[in-house]
Amino acid sequence: MSLRIDAVILAGGQARRMGGQDKGLVELLGKPMIEHAITRIQPQVKEILINANRNQNLYAQFADCVFGDEDSGFLGPLAGMVTAMGKTQADLLLVVPCDCPCLPTDLVARMAAALEAEAADLAVASDGEYEQPVVMLLKPSLRDSMKAFLAAGERKIDFWYAKHKVAVVSFADQPNAFVNVNTPEQVEQLSKALTQ
């Protein structure tokens, strides 16, 4: 029996370093940033969900399920993740940010393999040097744990996942896979790098 895997793309932040522009809709090489993430992720999952706290009508062109955080107040990525876990019927949920346009095309396969091999609750990607806390594959059954963590006033993803059995999956062979774009200058730099 194969597992159903859905993905949620997190686009719910305030994007302060992007001058308040909605990062997922900022264009990179003529396409919104989120479209780059979708192109990389779509073949790897059954359904894509988008967590967005603004411009939901614009995001609706990219996914059937677009939703805001259950708890208003921009509580960070965990708030989007906990909401997504309540909306999916999947066995596993892939979480990725909207501002990572170069995600690995073998992300799900490698993370699912590590999750199974290590009998872990979740898998977190690493660039070989640093863990990427907002790139993870997890069981939606962890929702209650995450809700309790948020209710206690906690916000840091890595503090939450440290409470569970975690498989860290290295993508050192793809050093630019998790390049994320936070400022207009970084958009320009990445545009140049991708067209060289």
Swiss-Prot record:
Mg(2+) binds at D99. PANTHER family: MOLYBDENUM COFACTOR GUANYLYLTRANSFERASE. This is Molybdenum cofactor guanylyltransferase. Keywords: Cytoplasm, GTP-binding, Magnesium, Metal-binding, Molybdenum cofactor biosynthesis, Nucleotide-binding, Transferase. The gene is mobA. The keyword Metal-binding applies. Gene3D superfamilies: Spore Coat Polysaccharide Biosynthesis Protein SpsA, Chain A (3.90.550.10). One of its GO terms (cellular component) is cytoplasm. NCBIfam families: molyb_mobA. Transfers a GMP moiety from GTP to Mo-molybdopterin (Mo-MPT) cofactor (Moco or molybdenum cofactor) to form Mo-molybdopterin guanine dinucleotide (Mo-MGD) cofactor. It holds the Pfam family NTP_transf_3.
